[in-house]
Regions:
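Bacterial N-terminal signal peptides
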Residues: 4-14
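Extracellular, repeat-based ectodomains that mediate carbohydrate processing or recognition
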Residues: 19-415
Length: 415
């Protein structure tokens, strides 16, 4: 069930139907003067490497310029044509998978994995707050969400005995954006894990918190989600993807990975992931929508168009905004080299796929992360490589609707 039903119970605004309804600015390098041998990565759990807060855009990534993997942030005023000089946010021997969360008023919260633990710090164009370790056990893959910039939920994968388990903690920030407290982490599913749980994504609305993750308890990977209406008491996990039973030759389940969540409209939640139920051609991009703040999700929907059917898709990211607009980005090589592709929700369903010109050329364009601002502008970052195995560079471009093809006007949310 989609986040807006077609005409009966609308829940999302919907973008224009035309595939050519976006104008993109020229691409900008996020980080300057990087040596050719440096590898940059955009690998946050749930693909949240970019966020907009007030009039400021922030991007986080990891690279090995210092000789070890470390995490960095760079800022850009929305009207500016270049990014600030990047700032080093990690403090340990090595750091990975940074995520960024908008707190409001040009402030952000960054989270990352450092030396086997999860760390947080507030960041803004005016400076960095103190770095705070919030986990003790072997942990990683942190994801963050908030509704008000003051009360934040952090989730990550943490080793519990032989296996990893998804845990959650509440973080509180003060009036100036400083971290003032972090609760002890609690398992989202209190049962001891019987196999690994990994790569969580989290969404927070006024109706509560929803966490989705990869889970191996059935002997194959499924996507599970759990919802907490109040506090940190989560419901029993439920399947997000529709499990396709295969033969012994092709294995059990459909093969799913890398779920990402985003809030859209009046507290609704959209999900996307890679799904190999059409196993002959590799992963496809699927989606599902929750109309009740994450307590339940509707039917799975194929987000890509028919032109993508013979190609594998990778690295899905999703973004929504308060107007109810929803867009998904990924990379595939249907045109001969890997390009970034977009699909967005319209009144007719998912749009035809569109490759933004700055992120589609004879180079390798992969690993997108996206954010929609309140005006419906799309902020896109991705990795650009000369060849498939060469060092990647984080690039940025902004997309706007054409003036004669604006989104449909919003309709009241269903009750």
């Amino acid at each position: 069930m989609m986040c807006r039903l077609l005409l009966a119970l609308p829940l999302i605004t919907g973008f224009p139907v035309q595939a050519d309804s976006w104008n993109f600015d020229n691409k900008i390098a996020v980080s300057k003067n990087i040596e050719a041998s440096v590898f940059q990565h955009l690998d946050s759990s749930g693909r949240k490497n970019i966020a907009v807060s007030g009039k400021t855009l922030a991007v986080v990534w990891e690279d090995n310029r210092s000789g070890a993997s470390q995490t960095y942030v760079a800022f850009k005023k929305l009207e500016a044509n270049e990014f600030s000089k990047e700032q080093h946010i990690s403090t340990g021997k090595s750091a990975f998978t940074p995520a960024i969360l908008a707190l409001g008023e040009d402030r952000f919260l960054a989270g990352w994995e450092q030396d086997g633990a999860v760390w947080l710090r507030t960041v803004s164009p005016t400076g960095l707050g103190p770095a705070l370790q919030i986990s003790q056990a072997e942990t990683g893959q942190v994801a963050l969400a908030t509704t008000d910039g003051r009360n934040i939920i952090a989730v990550w994968s943490q080793r519990t005995g032989r296996f990893t388990q998804i845990v959650a903690a509440m973080i509180k920030t003060g009036a100036r954006g400083e971290i003032i407290s972090a609760s002890a982490p609690k398992p989202v599913d209190p049962k001891l894990p019987v196999d690994d749980q990994s790569y969580p994504s989290v969404a927070l609305t006024k109706k509560g918190a929803t966490v989705a993750w990869e889970d191996r308890r059935r002997g194959h990977t499924v996507l599970l989600y759990s919802h907490a209406a109040t506090g940190m008491t989560f419901s029993a996990p439920q399947p997000l993807n529709e499990v396709v039973q295969k033969s012994e030759q092709y294995g059990r389940g459909s093969g799913v990975t890398r779920v990402a969540l985003s809030v859209c409209g009046n507290g609704q939640i959209a999900a996307t992931w890679m799904d190999k139920r059409g196993y002959q051609t590799g992963y496809d991009i699927y989606s599902a929508f929750s109309r009740d703040g994450g307590a339940s999700f509707g039917a799975n929907e194929l987000a890509q168009d028919a032109f993508a059917d013979q190609y594998a898709q990778w690295h899905p990211a999703i973004a929504g905004n308060a107007s109810g607009e929803v867009i998904v980005a990924w990379d595939d090589d249907r045109d001969g080299t890997s390009d970034i592709w977009l699909a967005w929700k319209t009144k007719r369903g998912w749009s035809a796929n569109f490759a933004p010109p700055p992120a589609s050329n004879n180079r390798q364009q992969t690993n997108p992360a996206i954010s929609l601002d309140t005006q419906g502008n799309l902020h896109l970052v991705w990795l650009e490589q000369e060849t498939e195995n060469s060092p990647g560079r984080v690039m940025y471009a902004m997309g706007q609707h054409q003036s004669d093809s604006q989104p449909l006007s919003a309709a009241p949310s269903a009750k």
